[in-house]
Amino acid sequence: MEILNQFSQFSPNMEAQGASSIPQPSQDAHEKARQQAENQETAKNGMISQILDQAAMQRLSNLAVAKPEKAQMVEAALINMARRGQLSGKMTDDGLKALMERVSAQTQKATSVKFDRRRNELDSDEELDL
């Protein structure tokens, strides 16, 4: 009976409305999320500019253009190092190079080519082709 009462509460116009009756996230929520992401990006860039010297910043910018994923990993490593107190003063270009090499070594996938030569039962080494 309770289910029937719930169905009777729907008006016939609700079917015609279709998807418009489903609550949609407001534009304010999207704007708020975008603003929050922008604020986080600004804070991250501010921290990185305090961590790196000019030459290292230029190198990181070049890396971000060429390989954005790797640049994000290096930025995350820099921020973690700064939060842990592992950095003393601004990191130089040489220090950033070393960090980039460590990140590359950790993420480098070993690629190998493997030849699988399977022999047919029809083709035997014992037979001679004449």
Swiss-Prot record:
Provide this UniProt record's keywords sorted from A to Z.
Coiled coil
Q: Does the keyword Electron transport apply?
A: no
Q: Where is this region: Disordered?
A: 1-46, 103-130
- GO cellular component terms, A-Z: cytosol; nucleus
Q: Which GO terms describe its molecular function?
A: DNA binding
User: What's a Pfam family this protein contains?
Assistant: dsDNA_bind
- Using the record for this protein, list the coiled-coil segments as residue ranges, or answer none: 27-51
> Quick check: keyword Transferase in the entry?
no
Compositionally biased, Polar residues: which spans?
1-27, 36-46
Family to which the UniProt record says this protein belongs:
Belongs to the PDCD5 family.
Q: What protein does this entry describe?
A: Uncharacterized protein D2005.3
Organism, per UniProt?
Caenorhabditis elegans
